[in-house]
Amino acid sequence: MPATMKRLIRFVLRHVPRRYIQRVVHLCTPVLGLAYAGRGVECPVCGAHYRRFMPYGYVNPRGNALCPRCLALERHRLMWLYLKNETAFFETPARLLHVAPERCFLKRFEKLPALDYVTADLESPLAKVKMDIQ
């Protein structure tokens, strides 16, 4: 199953434009995540448990990378843990312009009452503001 999953993910990432992937991936991965049910790993972003995370990567998909529930990658989980454990980000009033927003953070950041949150990107359908930051 994992080798087949890696080939499927590699094919989709190489041949489907990113803007389309971003619109439907949150509908597909929870179903694919059923194959990863278990208690081996926990995603700190969404709290879901899996036997392991799904593979992810364009050229050589790396195993144990993508959370099927919230779509957090390793870097997203690390950033979440840093913000939660080393900063007052979730409690302190702030304004945040999030350029190239990650789906795993969008709803969570929007729900923070102390955060004035705006997303921006040139092509992403996830962004509220279409912006080129060159």
Residue ranges of predicted features:
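Conserved N-terminal segment of class I S-adenosyl-L-methionine
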Residues: 2-134
